Amino acid sequence: MVKRKNSDNSGTVAQGNYEAKVAEIEAIISRIESGELELETVFEQFANAVQYLRQCDTFLQQRQQQIDLLIETLNEQDGDQIPRVSNDGIEPKK
């Protein structure tokens, strides 16, 4: 069996690697579901998948914060010229 190690110890996923991490998670799931792995390898692969999921979650949270900040900055710069989005939809300009 080939053992894979996570070379990214920073806990974050670079933008270009997000899709690669998701693909690796899917591959890990397939290997585990195949039933052909030894139990120790299953645990190692599962631990890797959890680590990748956490990295992807951190990446998505960071991007959401960036988007929120950009929207806030845009709204502050343009004042009420841009309709603000609420949970119900678009609020009319005041």
Curated annotation (Swiss-Prot):
Gene for this chain: xseB
Subcellular localization: Cytoplasm
GO BP terms in the entry: DNA catabolic process
HAMAP family, per the entry: Exonuc_7_S (MF_00337)
Keyword Acetylation belongs to the record: no
Source species, domain of life: Bacteria
Subunit structure: Heterooligomer composed of large and small subunits.
Family, as annotated: Belongs to the XseB family.
Pfam families assigned: Exonuc_VII_S
InterPro entries in the cross-refs: Exonuc_VII_S, Exonuc_VII_ssu_sf
Record bears the keyword Lyase: no
Catalytic activity field: Exonucleolytic cleavage in either 5'- to 3'- or 3'- to 5'-direction to yield nucleoside 5'-phosphates
Listed name of the protein: Exodeoxyribonuclease 7 small subunit
